[in-house]
Amino acid sequence: MAIGLIGRKVGMTRIFTEDGASIPVTVIEIAANRVTQVRTLETDGYRALQVTTGTKKANRITKPEAGHFAKAGVEAGRGLWEVRLADDEGEGIEVGAELNVDIFADVAKVDVTGQSKGKGFQGGIKRWNFHAQDMTHGNSLAHRSNGSIGQNQTPGRVFKGKKMSGHMGAERVTTQNLDVVRVDAERNLLLVKGAVPGATNGNLIIKPAVKA
């Protein structure tokens, strides 16, 4: 486990290597992560850092939030996140400290977590990649139907977890082992190879890869 940071998905572009190869990259803005609270084994039963980033309009901040940020002595951010710490991590980090993108300077691969784009209510073909049925040859009603969803009198029910139509997307997704292409500490940018979950401007959690 290693310290992660909160970022914002800016969008995708591409960069070129010296030999002319094109690399598709996602640009992630990682502004300073301000520590608002330090969780400890003694008081909370686990070790973690609570951080905020970005800004929030003053009229959108509740009184409890305002008090929490004021106690930490940091500017109010757009949200609060917790990053778990291993036993040997986070020593010396105190409330009010700032964590920046340069902690990824020596990291080769990262895991990126975000909320996937919501797709609304979708059928089995789009949601689960089911095969469509015949368009002709006697089929006139069930072209995109799920087909059979179970057996007969035994068991006489549909099993829990059966893949069917329903709400798709808008859930927590992690993409693992993305190559770090560039760290731009001056502009607080991290460029990773490939796509990451979520829409433009969505919040992301970036951590060093656990499987690297």
From Swiss-Prot:
The keyword rRNA-binding applies. The keyword RNA-binding applies. One of its GO terms (cellular component) is cytosolic large ribosomal subunit. Gene3D superfamilies: 3.30.160.810, Translation factors (2.40.30.10). One of its GO terms (molecular function) is structural constituent of ribosome. It comes from the Bacteria. NCBIfam families: L3_bact (TIGR03625). Part of the 50S ribosomal subunit. Forms a cluster with proteins L14 and L19. This is Large ribosomal subunit protein uL3.
